[in-house]
Amino acid sequence: MKLAPYILERLTSVNRTNGTADLLVPLLRELAKGRPVSRTTLAGILDWPAERVAAVLEQATSTEYDKDGNIIGYGLTLRETSYVFEIDDRRLYAWCALDTLIFPALIGRTARVSSHCAATGAPVSLTVSPSEIQAVEPAGMAVSLVLPQEAADVRQSFCCHVHFFASVPTAEDWASKHQGLEGLAIVSVHEAFGLGQEFNRHLLQTMSSRTP
């Protein structure tokens, strides 16, 4: 996948730019418990002052909140989407196909993922552990990727275009009708998982380099 290095660099750059790199993993692990996360809880876990948490969240404009101002979604969400992400008998959701391949390694849990082909509506499913994917149905499942934009709203600029497809040919036919998307690429689900693993390594290295 020739675009992989560029997609990876853009993804990591977006996280650096909006300041979410250090916040992402603790937030995901709290959301994975299946309940809203207060800013106070997040500040305590990160050992950050409340003002720093507020400043980072202000930059991450895609963040979802409940009516009380608690966080209910950032990549992993309590609100229903097309990407079902089940862990420990809890039904959660993700913003896009790539999220479902990235998050198990970051939260240290195996997830059962189910969705639909973005072109045909056919069901797709797989099991994603921190280190591998299994039970891929259909076996030829594919994923669409685009170059992430340098924008605060990563959900709108990237996630909304990253889908599962029942097969590579089906995805390529869909892509032929969406050529206006910058850097649009179709890859196998295994290639997408590999990209996600590489993103995780970059993210965790960034976090460890900032740890006193």
From Swiss-Prot:
A GO molecular-function descriptor: alkylmercury lyase activity
Example GO BP: response to mercury ion
EC identifiers of the protein: 4.99.1.2
SUPFAM superfamilies: NosL/MerB-like, Winged helix' DNA-binding domain
Keyword Lyase: yes
A Pfam family per the record: MerB
Top-level division of the source organism's lineage: Bacteria
InterPro entries: MerB, MerB_HTH_dom, MerB_lyase_sf, WH_DNA-bd_sf
Keyword field contains Ion transport: no
Functional summary from the UniProt entry: Cleaves the carbon-mercury bond of organomercurials such as phenylmercuric acetate. One product is Hg(2+), which is subsequently detoxified by the mercuric reductase.
HAMAP family with a match to the protein in the record: MerB
Entry protein name: Alkylmercury lyase
Native source organism of the sequence: Rhizobium meliloti (Ensifer meliloti)
